[in-house]
Amino acid sequence: MMKIGADTKMLNFGLWKNSPTLYDAQKEMSQYITEFGEFNSAKKILDVGSGFCIPATIWKEKNPKLDIFCMDLNFSELKNGNNHIISQINSSSSEIPFFDKSFDRVIALESAQHFVPLERFFVEARRVLSDDGKLVLAIPVIKEGSLLKLGILNITWLSKKYTESYIKDTIKNTGFILRKEESIGSMVYEPFADYYIQNRKSLKEKLITTYSKRIEDLVFRSMKKMKEISEKKIIDYLLFSLDKSS
């Protein structure tokens, strides 16, 4: 829906440190991942759940020497990416169609919350990583035992609601080493919700050309709820950098 309302095909909430619009925030998030994931020392990257490949295009523009592969289960998004400088693969996160040790980075930028089972993705990511490779995640999480506190987001947040402890257990159980973690929820959810609320009139006009007014009202209520529970630390947004080996 935000693709229609805000004229952007990037499928992330954005990082709102220095960004006035959703597109700017999404670009800022994509650029920050290159720093967090240490792309400067990478050569070959697999972006899992890549959507329209726009973050990958940003990474390629910043470092033209990177060999980047976009992989997504949704063929229509890959097809509509109109990308001729990045390889595109239509496949599932649980069956990555590459040989062992093919990449030095595997990235899941706000996509791993859709992967079921998550453990299978971790196993596959570890398999295709080189011995000195890294798995980099940007993922929404909820506080332990807080499902009932999500309210309307239980309906409108169309993904798994993983907890930080579940993800860390999965990291340990699949043989990864947690090297770096960062909490950025306050720079994601609250400004994202504020952006929608402050620009609701113009965004609503665009949304109701495709969806009903009732759907837009659900979006608006979801934004208010998102801001509320982010301020209460019921939801967070975490970045993880994982080493394949010690």
Where are the model-predicted features located?
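Conserved catalytic loop of SAM-dependent methyltransferase domains
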Residues: 180-207
